[in-house]
Amino acid sequence: MTDIHAQDLAARYIALWSEPDAELRRRAIEELWAEGGAHILQPPQEIREIAAGLGFDSTTLQAHGYDELDVRVTRSYERFVAPGQFTFQARDGAVRLHDVVKLNWEMVPVGGGEAVGGGLEVLVLDENGRITTDYMFPGI
């Protein structure tokens, strides 16, 4: 497997979510993920509770392939970063074990201040060091 430093991958991964240029975002998606790669999100507790109230035992949100990943990242950018209030940053301490990278991230106010959100990311990599599956667990 490609020699990848976990913290470097974490920085590139998190930078993608704050990238304002749509073409650069798409290029970063294609560089980070393997073709057909997936982003699987455990939704926030509020959404899980609403789903349970509707009779769903579990709720998982998924994006597969470059086009769906592009939509997912773009919508996150538009909601959280584009208005100019927040940005995302990787926290220190990313680690790699074989083909798995674990990292933590946070959403912070532009200009500094305490994190208002964040989460855990578990990335499964292919033999070329590209993401095949990205498991996101939001929440601080």
What residue ranges belong to the model's regions?
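C-terminal and inter-domain tail/linker signature
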Residues: 1-140
